[in-house]
C-alpha cells in the first residue's frame, strides 16, 4: 500500500506478511497428496513456475498478469491445464 504522492509504503509489515503467505502457500501446495494422480509432477512444476513468476513480479513491483504474459512470450512457457 502506498501513501498518496509520497512514494513510501504505509505499513512496513505488509511485505513480510505477503512473503509469509506466499511461503505458506508454496509449502502447502508442494506436499504430496494421496489422490494426485498422473498429473502430480506436472502440477508441482506448474505451481513452482507460477510462484516463481509471482515472486519476480512482486520483487519488480509489476502487475502479475502483464509479467506472466511477457515471461510466457520471452521464455515460450505454455501453462495448459486439462480440466
From Swiss-Prot:
Keywords: Membrane, Transmembrane, Transmembrane helix. The chain crosses the membrane at residues 64-82. It is found in: Membrane. GO terms for cellular component: membrane. It holds the Pfam family DUF4560. Signal peptide: none annotated. It comes from the Eukaryota. This is Small integral membrane protein 10. The keyword NADP does not apply. The keyword Transmembrane helix applies. It comes from Homo sapiens. InterPro entries: SMIM10 (IPR029367). It is a single-pass membrane protein.
Amino acid at each position: 500500500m502506498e501513501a498518496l504522492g509520497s512514494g513510501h509504503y504505509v505499513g512496513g509489515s505488509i511485505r513480510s506478511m505477503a512473503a509469509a503467505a506466499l511461503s505458506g502457500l508454496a509449502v502447502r501446495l508442494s506436499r504430496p497428496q494421496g489422490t494426485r494422480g498422473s498429473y502430480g509432477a506436472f502440477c508441482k512444476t506448474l505451481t513452482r513456475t507460477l510462484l516463481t513468476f509471482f515472486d519476480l513480479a512482486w520483487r519488480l513491483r509489476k502487475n502479475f498478469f502483464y509479467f506472466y504474459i511477457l515471461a510466457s512470450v520471452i521464455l515460450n512457457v505454455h501453462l495448459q491445464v486439462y480440466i
